[in-house]
């Protein structure tokens, strides 16, 4: 699908990956709408890219429905917004748990449902769900985050089959460890030894490629991480033993403590 001239709704536009996406989409000639819950940051992003803005908290059901209503004419949905959701499950309050599930899983599912109905009626559209390699492999102290990303992956792959033949494509883009954005940039923690990182720009390129080529799944990660995640998905017990031997507890604690305030 050609992005040029298409109306694109981008959620999570104020973060590192979101900013890179906004830049790529604008360069491709998209008619961009960005959404977020922080008005000042959203306005800055809109000013930078000449985008329309819709203020919405994706943890609030009425805001999600309102966002879909205001963007009913969108040709492309890029569901990029997500909370980090790191930490042991027992450390979460019920409210924090609900918020992570709402933002990371329920909101993209609901937006996809509401907007795809209009896309199917027009016989044209594309939905991109930005997941994570954490949707393929489980790691310690990310049980809630893994749950949302595993769920998003299953949803995306099944929805693609449901919409086959309607003119509406569905793609899942799964970044690996991203430098200059996300948990490593926010916490100062180092990625595991021997694992390379990717840039927000590479993730944005993966999203654009997914739309242009109607790709089912795009894994934006170096070869070693793609192989490790594939093995972990097939042999979780083996992956658990490898992670235990890697002695990642210090890095994990650093990430969890730094992200606690973002729940």
Segments from the language model and where they lie:
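Conserved glycine-rich cofactor-binding loop
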Residues: 14-15
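The beta1-alpha1 cofactor-binding region of Rossmann-like NAD(H)/NADP(H)-dependent oxidoreductases
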Residues: 55-66, 94
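Substrate-binding pocket helix/loop in short-chain dehydrogenase/reductase
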Residues: 88-89, 93-101
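Active-site loop immediately N-terminal to the catalytic Tyr-X3-Lys motif
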Residues: 90, 139-143
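Active-site helix of classical SDR
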Residues: 112, 148
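Residue(s) in the substrate-gating loop at a strand-loop-helix junction
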Residues: 132
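C-terminal helical subdomain
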Residues: 172, 192-226
């Amino acid at each position: 699908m050609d992005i040029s001239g298409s109306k694109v709704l981008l959620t999570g536009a104020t973060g590192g990956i979101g900013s890179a996406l906004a830049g790529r989409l604008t360069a491709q000639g998209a008619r961009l709408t960005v959404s977020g819950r922080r008005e000042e940051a959203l306005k800055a992003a809109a000013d930078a890219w000449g985008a329309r803005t819709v203020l919405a908290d994706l943890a609030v059901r009425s805001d999600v429905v309102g966002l879909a209503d205001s963007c009913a004419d969108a040709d492309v949905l890029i569901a990029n917004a997500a909370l980090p959701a790191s930490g042991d499950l027992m450390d979460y309050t019920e409210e924090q748990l609900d918020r992570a599930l709402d933002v990371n899983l329920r909101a993209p599912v609901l937006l996809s449902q509401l907007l795809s109905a209009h896309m199917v009626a027009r016989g044209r559209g594309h939905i991109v769900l930005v997941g994570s390699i954490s949707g393929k492999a489980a790691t310690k102290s990310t049980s809630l985050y893994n749950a949302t990303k595993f769920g998003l992956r299953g949803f995306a792959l099944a929805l693609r089959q449901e919409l086959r033949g309607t003119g509406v494509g569905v793609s899942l883009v799964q970044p690996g460890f991203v430098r200059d954005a996300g948990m490593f940039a926010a916490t100062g923690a180092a990625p595991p030894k021997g694992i390379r990182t990717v840039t927000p720009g590479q993730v944005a390129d993966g999203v654009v490629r997914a739309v242009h080529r109607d790709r089912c799944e795009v894994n934006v990660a170096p070869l070693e991480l793609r192989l490790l995640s594939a093995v972990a998905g097939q042999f979780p017990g083996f992956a658990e033993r490898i992670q235990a031997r890697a002695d990642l507890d210090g890095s994990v604690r650093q990430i969890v403590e730094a992200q606690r305030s973002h729940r």
